[in-house]
């Protein structure tokens, strides 16, 4: 019995000796999930679409988000005072500033706001542990911890996600992103040597094996209060915002499939681990320095809410200047809309029959070419619709297993499209893709980097010389759509039935307003761009098509709508397509303004002449922004062609720069109005939308997409270091498509390069929040807002402006559940 008791006693002692595994409390988990949820995604280069980098914080007012980001990471969401000084001298009027003051109910005067622009900014910001340690480090002889942490995490992620991507999934031994990083870092003795810090590796060896244990241990050790965890974690994620955004993209893709992953929490754990290692290392290295660090750290933690409040107060006047700049633009635009309303009321007694209806993407670049095409003849009618033309598809080249989405990033594809081809053509396509894949795989493999240069250097030197003297366009085989008018549409590996095709076609025609009064020729115009040696080329293509050209979408839709069996089925839905009506797929090249029509036998000579003249008109209008307004005709054409094929050209076109408005109305109300390529134009007739379903669709999809585009350009101008990708000339592509580094390291860069925003002398994009004008009853607009939280957050938190545009020209702003007449 005594022996038994002794053994029991021994076991109790052993149990007590076992270290407890740290665990997060429910409050801590909630706070960490909050921080992880604040990061917006960035898409890969081959599917590049514009993203609002503050999307995941849309439920907060933009000024509060701005203050928090400024306090936590020095990221800027509003332009600097120097910018507003220039705007004040050049374009703003006192009445614009006064109106902004009145709107925001601030006790300021125009004079003291002007003085504010001359004051120096002196505001402290949050410092992570690594920043405090760097402040006492001899930077002449030692590398900064901030730089090393960024470099180490970035290089690890580049390698890790390259391997994951090439395999299509994680390996069988994968135990989590944090675990993989920990194993890699423990084996890397070079960090200790590089940083000149003996004993550093031991602290990595002591880190917990799981991300949750690490987070729990570090939060306790660093004495982070539950109330400050979310902001502290957010600050750490902002330290590596590029890779955090990539992880957010992987999360986004999983959620489209109703799945979840823990990558963001693991990524956060990696950054927290570095904080904890440095804290422990300082504690062991120099107790007196550590004590100073501890005092500063805990003091900073205690005043974090006050720090954020200080930044909010400091930025208040800048937001008035921002609002004044937006009022200046809105005032001018609204005068155009009011004048257009007066003109629109002068109804013609007789209108010539429409010979051509051309449906374009709502992209701001389409506004210029649409206006040019309409100017050719009164029998031309254009309309605007989302560039994927309502097709929820992904494109799979014949004879392959690869596919790409052809729809907005907000949506998940449901239909797979494959060209109908002969066996010989399928085989040729497959061989071309396999050759391309092997070449890319060889070039991207780290061990092959130098051997590839040695083996192909002479060939590439010749290629470089050839491209310099005889520039030409190059197309990836997966983007080369074969010359066929037939496509196979499948869903869940089964061909679409006729009823499904009819249902799809009917929905699209109704949404586009093409379910009645059709012309003999209806052009479906997608768009794409042309540039060389441009990692961000997909960003110049159609964002609504997932960063691809719209070619496959318009060709598939034309195929469906020209199908006699589909037309017969549409009759049962009271949609009659006249026998003489032909749908023609076409492409608008936004770089050269040229049109390409597929099936020219359906486009008569008159229409071809209209298209050619419209190209000349649009090209001449755009020449000023390109710095080519000294050229005309053929000389201008040749110059633009050279730009498009020049491998050294960093500004082939200006993309969607200077976008500022989204107008939802019948084209008849805006025809002839020069929006200067700054407005997204979406056709909509509320009288054909009895159940408000079309307006709901527009405000929850295209309006959200335009917000993403608008705020990506806005953010890339406000803070290109954080939300832009820097100097295009210095870009190095990460794993073929993940993103770019600026130079050979640092964080993954997101957003737009400087050359897409600035011409070397001035900004080519004016950073203004999107102004949305909707021709619909106010009650209807308010109902859509009330029923959709995303829309309400965007409007009430001033991520965009929402206006009603009445038939008599009156304009009212909707804000906080009330309509306010706009001056």
Curated annotation (Swiss-Prot):
Intracellular DIC accumulation is sensitive to CCCP (carbonyl cyanide-m-chlorophenylhydrazone) and DCCD (N,N-dicyclohexylcarbodiimide) and therefore likely driven by either proton potential, ATP, or both. GO terms for cellular component: plasma membrane. It comes from the Bacteria. Keywords: Cell inner membrane, Cell membrane, Membrane, Metal-binding, Transport, Zinc. Disruption phenotype: Cells do not grow in low DIC levels, increased carboxysome content. Decreased ability to accumulate and fix DIC under DIC-limiting conditions. Its main location: membrane. InterPro entries: DabA. Pfam families: DabA. One of its GO terms (molecular function) is zinc ion binding. Its cofactor is Zn(2+). Zn(2+) binds at residues 361, 363, 527, 542. Induction: Induced by growth in low levels of dissolved inorganic carbon (DIC) (at protein level). It is found in: Cell inner membrane. It is a peripheral membrane protein. Forms a complex with DabB. Belongs to the inorganic carbon transporter (TC 9.A.2) DabA family. Part of an energy-coupled inorganic carbon pump. This is Probable inorganic carbon transporter subunit DabA. It comes from Hydrogenovibrio crunogenus (strain DSM 25203 / XCL-2) (Thiomicrospira crunogena).
